[in-house]
Amino acid sequence: QETYYHEFRANSWKYTENGYFFMEEYHPAGYDGPSGYRAFRVVPLNKKCRELNRKYILPFGYTLNKLFTSNWSEKNYDGINFYDVFDRLLSMEEKTDEFKEGKTYEIPKESFETIFQKYFNISAEILQTGTVFHTEIQTYRYRTRGIVYDFAPTPYIPYPEVVSYIENQDGTITLEVNAVWPQKELDQAFCHSVTIRLLDKDRFQYVSNYVSRSEIEVTWYTERLSDEKWEECYGDN
């Protein structure tokens, strides 16, 4: 059943070797509405790849975190902001409503580490090094991003697509992922390999990410507020 119909004149179009058809809608000079770029996958993806994408990659995506745009492994988490990851884990655990903008929270050590260690094989020592940890009260400081000051998501960014996978002998699975960016007409804005450890009871852990190819810079990522800037924005709350 047809629920939406939109007719337009195309300004440009391109078909790629990987089976994508990109099209740009014509807009007159001075137009200030939604983007006119569209991407259509003509060559269908393997059903298993789509399932893997929905389960492991889309929950993080590329918005306000660098989990899939940085190189890291269980031996080296450099380049990853643990608070960005924690934000996404809270969303996956459906606990985002517990925290409000402009407030400082002290999360008990066990609670913070339990959420992380459910999805990552990471020690408490590493987590404490990359966060603000208060030894005397055994808590992690946590502040959400602010809608006004450091949230600022860019609406037109790439989206991930798992195109193949390898089941490894050690019980992990490596997903080959292409970042599709309609606004740039790129079906491989960058490519990365994500290794997942499969556990019992449908559980899993992220093991590593490796960016194998990139044609772009990650210009849409917004850094979290520094302590000084946070006090300037929210100090009176």
Please describe what each predicted stretch is.
Residues 1, 45-147:
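Core segments of small alpha/beta cavity-forming domains
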Residues 34-45, 184-193, 199, 206-237:
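Low-complexity, intrinsically disordered terminal/linker segments enriched in charged
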Residues 11, 148-190:
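Functional cores of ribonucleases/endoribonucleases
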Residues 131, 177-181, 208-210:
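A mature extracytoplasmic/lumenal domain signature
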Residues 5-13:
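Repeated scaffold domains used in trafficking and secretory/extracellular systems
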